[in-house]
Amino acid sequence: MLHIEFITDLGAKVTVDVESADKLLDVQRQYGRLGWTSGEVPVGGYQFPLENEPDFDWSLIGARKWTNPEGEEMILHRGHAYRRRELEAVDSRKMKLPAAVKYSRGAKNTDPEHVREKADGEFEYVTLAIFRGGKRQERYAVPGSNRPQAGAPARSAATRAQGARPGAVAVQDEETPF
């Protein structure tokens, strides 16, 4: 029997028994849909393959998608809203990085120094997750979702924002009201 410790959306610690390792992600999804989290976000954010970004199951980390009043799709996690940012590939003498999608937010003065990342100027930010390179992991996808076609570009933030508002009123029965 495995045990996983969650922090509820109200800050209570709860230990849940898991029958076997192959049931672990199902349990994380179940409680993650309630906004419960297990563990801390690693410095630099969670790392996932880029191919998982379009249908990533945010409940695995206790997060969910949310559309703000301006129609921008964001990710809510532990009371913070994270923006989607597309990062271009870097190919220089010093560094070579493939294109990526990052979910981050502006740092707050209450954020610990070790999670803050420097940007241009004096601006600092905190990363929740970054999707870059790697091979797709089906276990990270929303169960039953249609896998995005290989080579199909992800919708840009502008395209999503234009079409996001009409669909924002649809609410699933399972969704929590936070």
Swiss-Prot record:
One of its GO terms (biological process) is DNA repair. InterPro entries: ssDNA-bd_DdrB-like (IPR024305). Residues 147-165 have a biased composition (Low complexity). One of its GO terms (molecular function) is single-stranded DNA binding. This is Single-stranded DNA-binding protein DdrB. Induction: Induced to high levels following extreme ionizing radiation exposure. Also highly induced in response to desiccation stress. Contains a novel ssDNA-binding fold, which is structurally and topologically distinct from the OB-fold universally found in standard SSB proteins. The disordered C-terminus of DdrB may mediate interactions with other proteins important for DNA damage recovery. It comes from the Bacteria. Pfam families: DdrB.
